[in-house]
């Protein structure tokens, strides 16, 4: 069975160096004046890719020659004991892309030797010598060189296959790890709200003791879930530095689904912001109150229709409010406001949702990177815990909805220079124009 090389295969520097050394050996020991090592090219009928070509004492870059095309039957099939043909065999014409022409081939002074290992023919060794006839001892030496080149080519292909397989598996592993990190981060907001509501319910409870015990159980289980979540996040951040060993299954069984695929599949629809915002604001007002922060909402335009995705918008607003509350000190303020904007250059109508706070602000040098994964900037040096995922998730989801997200800091909401504040403005396409 003739082997072929994938178009993705790239011969290593080590293989090229080995071929060059073997070619030099042929030049010096057997007085060969032209020699070429060619590899089978997948998807090219009877085409062979030049790996190393030598003309006289000069090693020519393989790109200087084109494909070598061999008519049917010009290369004898390998025998069972892998011995070379007993007589020289012909070679077809060599096409080229440089000024260096191969020498004219005399039928009795050329050899085309198949590079065979097992049932795989991976290429050819093409040799021309203008002086002298080929003898038995020389043929044995050529056979040994052809065998060693065949083994080297197969091992190099195998190494390249494993490298490609490792890269694909590593890509899959990195995506899965990123996906889990996003899911864990998105779980934090509803879990925090659940725990806050449970504590508020417990404070206001005036019923029987049995029902109170049920509420206390909810609080305890919420705290337990939060501990498990933190533990899982910690283990994720310490993930293994290397991907587990590869299995023997083909690379084609690995299907990498990068986050970019979600851009094409996220369904968008027209809906009113009033269907999404009120419950989110209610939950975060309770969370803010527990931390002595005032959360206000100016949402007279709550019935504004946008073109977006409900679940994605919920995650975006949750993350922005969570950040606003987290980075605002006690006694601070978080404001939510809605507006309609028209961009004259494009003629498009946008609904803008601005979330402003009187928090610690974002330095100018951080504002360009704040939406990158795992980037926390100056906040990473503070005492407030975070993963640097929230705003990256926001940017990803907003992009998938065809919207925009901008940041302004300082925002002029606070007069305290130590708390310049930040405003994140979410731009959503108005549903009226779709």
UniProtKB/Swiss-Prot annotation:
<keyword id="KW-0418">Kinase</keyword>
<keyword id="KW-0408">Iron</keyword>
<dbReference type="InterPro" id="IPR036097">
    <property type="entry name" value="HisK_dim/P_sf"/>
</dbReference>
<dbReference type="InterPro" id="IPR036890">
    <property type="entry name" value="HATPase_C_sf"/>
</dbReference>
<keyword id="KW-0902">Two-component regulatory system</keyword>
<dbReference type="GO" id="GO:0005737">
    <property type="term" value="C:cytoplasm"/>
</dbReference>
<dbReference type="Pfam" id="PF02518">
    <property type="entry name" value="HATPase_c"/>
</dbReference>
<keyword id="KW-0003">3Fe-4S</keyword>
<keyword id="KW-0411">Iron-sulfur</keyword>
<dbReference type="InterPro" id="IPR003018">
    <property type="entry name" value="GAF"/>
</dbReference>
<dbReference type="GO" id="GO:0000155">
    <property type="term" value="F:phosphorelay sensor kinase activity"/>
</dbReference>
<feature type="domain" description="Histidine kinase">
    <location>
        <begin position="182"/>
        <end position="432"/>
    </location>
</feature>
<dbReference type="InterPro" id="IPR005467">
    <property type="entry name" value="His_kinase_dom"/>
</dbReference>
<keyword id="KW-0479">Metal-binding</keyword>
<dbReference type="InterPro" id="IPR050736">
    <property type="entry name" value="Sensor_HK_Regulatory"/>
</dbReference>
<keyword id="KW-0597">Phosphoprotein</keyword>
<feature type="domain" description="GAF">
    <location>
        <begin position="16"/>
        <end position="152"/>
    </location>
</feature>
<comment type="similarity">
    <text>Belongs to the chloroplast sensor kinase protein family.</text>
</comment>
<dbReference type="Pfam" id="PF01590">
    <property type="entry name" value="GAF"/>
</dbReference>
<comment type="function">
    <text>Member of possibly 2 two-component regulatory system(s) Hik2/Rre1 and Hik2/RppA. Transduces PQ (plastoquinone) redox signals to photosystem gene expression machinery during the adjustment of photosystem stoichiometry. Reduced PQ suppresses its autophosphorylation activity (i.e. kinase activity is higher under oxidizing conditions). Member of two-component regulatory system Hik2/Rre1, controls expression of sigB (sll0306), sll0528, slr1119, slr0852 and ssr3188 in response to hyperosmotic stress.</text>
</comment>
<protein>
    <recommendedName>
        <fullName>Sensor histidine kinase Hik2</fullName>
        <ecNumber>2.7.13.3</ecNumber>
    </recommendedName>
</protein>
<keyword id="KW-0963">Cytoplasm</keyword>
<dbReference type="InterPro" id="IPR029016">
    <property type="entry name" value="GAF-like_dom_sf"/>
</dbReference>
<feature type="modified residue" description="Phosphohistidine; by autocatalysis">
    <location>
        <position position="185"/>
    </location>
</feature>
<dbReference type="InterPro" id="IPR003661">
    <property type="entry name" value="HisK_dim/P_dom"/>
</dbReference>
<feature type="short sequence motif" description="G1 box">
    <location>
        <begin position="357"/>
        <end position="361"/>
    </location>
</feature>
<dbReference type="InterPro" id="IPR004358">
    <property type="entry name" value="Sig_transdc_His_kin-like_C"/>
</dbReference>
<dbReference type="Pfam" id="PF00512">
    <property type="entry name" value="HisKA"/>
</dbReference>
<dbReference type="GO" id="GO:0046872">
    <property type="term" value="F:metal ion binding"/>
</dbReference>
<feature type="short sequence motif" description="G2 box">
    <location>
        <begin position="386"/>
        <end position="390"/>
    </location>
</feature>
<comment type="subunit">
    <text>Exists as monomers, tetramers, hexamers and other higher-order oligomers; all are able to autophosphorylate. Upon treatment with 0.5 M NaCl only tetramers are seen, which are probably inactive. Interacts with both RppA and Rre1.</text>
</comment>
<dbReference type="GO" id="GO:0051538">
    <property type="term" value="F:3 iron, 4 sulfur cluster binding"/>
</dbReference>
<keyword id="KW-0808">Transferase</keyword>
<feature type="binding site">
    <location>
        <position position="19"/>
    </location>
    <ligand>
        <name>[3Fe-4S] cluster</name>
    </ligand>
</feature>
